[in-house]
A protein has these predicted regions:
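Class I S-adenosyl-L-methionine-dependent methyltransferase catalytic core
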Residues: 1-89
């Protein structure tokens, strides 16, 4: 299988008939499977309007936030740079 050096994603957000719970479920599924597509030293560049979802779900799935940038205070948009956490012995 081919593994990626980086994954760049613009995550969906609550709008119209889509509920916040449905968006949370998408984040759960994304963080639950993305490690299978990344090299060990791979990174995720993630654009999000759901800042509160990113850190806890990333940590729960073996990722850490290297950097966080606020893009628009008005729109509540952020870019996160994440990498995988490994136990180094």
């Amino acid at each position: 299988d081919y593994l990626f050096d980086e994954v760049i994603t613009d995550m969906p957000f609550q709008m119209g008939h889509v509920t916040e719970e449905e968006i949370y479920g998408l984040y759960l599924r994304f963080f639950g499977c993305i490690a299978g597509f990344l090299k060990e030293d791979g990174i995720i560049i993630l654009y999000s309007r759901n800042r509160g979802f990113v850190r806890p779900l990333a940590a729960r799935n073996g990722f850490s936030v290297l950097k966080e940038y606020e893009i628009s205070k008005k729109e509540g948009t952020y870019v996160f740079i994440l990498n995988r956490i490994f136990n180094r012995r």
